[in-house]
Amino acid sequence: MQKISNAEIAAIGTEILLGDLVDTNSAWLSQRLAALGVNVYRHTAVGDNRERIVAALGEAAARSDLVVTTGGLGPTSDDLTHECLSLLTGRPLAEYPEARRHVDEMFRRFGRKPTPSNYKQALFPQGSRLIPNPLGTAMGALLEHEGTLFATFPGVPGEMRTMFEETLAPAIRERTEGTIVSRTLWFAGIGESALAERVQDLLDARDPTVAPLAGEGKVRLRITTRAATPEEARKKIEPVEREILSRLGRYYFGRDDETLESAVGRLLRERGETLAVAESCTGGLLAKRLTDIPGSSEYFREGIVAYSNEAKERLLMVPREVLAEHGAVSEPVARGMAEGVRKLSGADYGLSVTGIAGPGGGTEEKPVGLVWVGVADGRGSEAVRLDLSAWARSRAAIRERSANMALDLLRRTLKKAKEA
């Protein structure tokens, strides 16, 4: 049995090339293959064309131990994956009775009758091992050919993921040497370049590898290594993690699946404290993210979206004269919003965001991307000015970064209170 150390992924479908469909499957597959110890070297997207699909699969097979395809397993004339795999390998298509029965059974569940074209999904290159699909009509295939294992999956993400975990993942485990383990550390309040400067020697190391990735006001460092067992891999990762945190601990908010909102929720829950938020330019995004966390009712009191000056005055008790003198996007108003929502809700903390998300509405004095975030507690309030003008063309990016930086301001406030 040939070992699998590397792979390529081919997403098949003209709709991907046209931009009508975003290929999330390849990203998910890359993460899962890496976790199983397989290096993914290339992603390919190819339209519904026989010659191009055959060429893409042939090129991938020449380079890789494993070629994974998604899409092209339907019953229509432009679903060509198994036909092209047959052409590439020289193995004729054959109808598999098991697959035909599966099509019949799935249609029976749907309360419908299959048409002759539906039985195209029972055709596979001879020698294929079928991949069961408990969620749809399209079964996949595992096929060995000249040192390469092909694995075909439907393009529907839920079906593909279930089939991968139940069939391909166990097959890969039998064919890999050792295991790859990764740990992700999350940071906020520091830029990618500043963070990289502090750990450059670790970024230059080969085992474990440390790789940064920034996005929307957060930076992550992924530590990755290969070892014979997961336990041995973790022992190699832990000293590197400790060294990173000794240098960057003040910016660290969690590992792996932790988010800023879950980190804030954990700190509030530990202290038995509560939070309310007042939002303007983020339009409820803060409240939405905070309440996405299961159990957030333990600490989240309420959220107010006060978009207009009149609403800020009426709902949050921001004085009219403060709004008139400083404008809605200002330090006094951000502090007033945080103080107001805290007082009105009876929460321990108030958190606020006010800014200009664009793409219009900016001035020379207050350009698009100017944002103030504020926090208030029993000791007083503070506000921080954010310059997000680099993202002036993306309203969504400004809102997302504003929410992240507001959450990080609250996180740092909670940590200070905990350490006091």
Swiss-Prot record:
Pfam families: CinA, CinA_KH, MoCF_biosynth. SMART domains: MoCF_biosynth (SM00852). It comes from the Bacteria. InterPro entries: CinA, CinA-like_C, CinA_C, CinA_KH, Competence-induced_CinA, MoaB/Mog-like_dom_sf, MoaB/Mog_dom. Belongs to the CinA family. This is CinA-like protein.
